[in-house]
């Protein structure tokens, strides 16, 4: 389950704090985060199969990150790569609102996804699986393979840990510690019996 935790306009010195794990499709070859030769403004990892990315930033203050929406029944084998949605925003010059209109036009062609994207002025979450778009107010958010702030145990623990880690900045150690959380959520039956 991929996880993106972020604090938007919640710290006086850091307008955006992100802690994220990409922990699915391990067999898919990737390149580590670096500035791209064909898009030198973009700092991101790279999907070596389809050429896109799952998370990146630019020197101009643009940010985008993607999670897959888990719904195997809706998967289309011929759908375009969702990683293209991230790089299209990062390498583009359109405003977040203009990009939102572009997303709405192409969203149905893709398998389920959630996309966080924005610049230093605004941050948006877009899902093609139910909630559409949402402008994010200042706060701490968690996104996994369902909708923004779905109260899954890993998301809830991560948001709480990120909120606490904000108080330790500029010390980054608590951010890395929260990403090492390997707790396993109890099955619904186990939780009901407890």
Show which residues each predicted segment covers:
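N-terminal nucleophile
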Residues: 1-194
């Amino acid at each position: 389950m991929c996880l993106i935790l972020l604090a938007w306009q919640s710290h006086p010195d850091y307008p955006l704090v992100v802690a994220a794990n990409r922990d699915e499709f391990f067999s898919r070859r990737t390149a580590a985060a670096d500035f791209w030769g064909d898009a030198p403004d973009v700092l991101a990892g790279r999907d070596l199969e389809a050429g896109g990315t799952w998370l990146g930033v630019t020197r101009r203050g643009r940010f985008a990150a993607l999670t897959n929406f888990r719904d195997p029944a809706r998967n289309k084998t011929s759908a375009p790569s969702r990683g293209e949605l991230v790089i299209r925003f990062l390498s583009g010059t359109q405003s977040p609102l203009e990009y939102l209109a572009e997303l709405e036009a192409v969203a149905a062609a893709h398998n389920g996804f959630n996309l966080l994207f924005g610049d230093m002025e605004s941050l948006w979450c877009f899902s093609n699986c139910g909630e559409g778009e949402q402008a994010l107010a200042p706060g701490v958010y968690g996104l996994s393979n369902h909708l923004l702030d779905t109260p899954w145990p890993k998301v809830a623990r991560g948001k709480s840990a990120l909120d606490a880690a904000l108080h330790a900045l500029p010390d980054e150690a608590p951010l890395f510690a929260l990403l090492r959380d390997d707790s396993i959520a109890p099955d619904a039956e186990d939780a009901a019996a407890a």
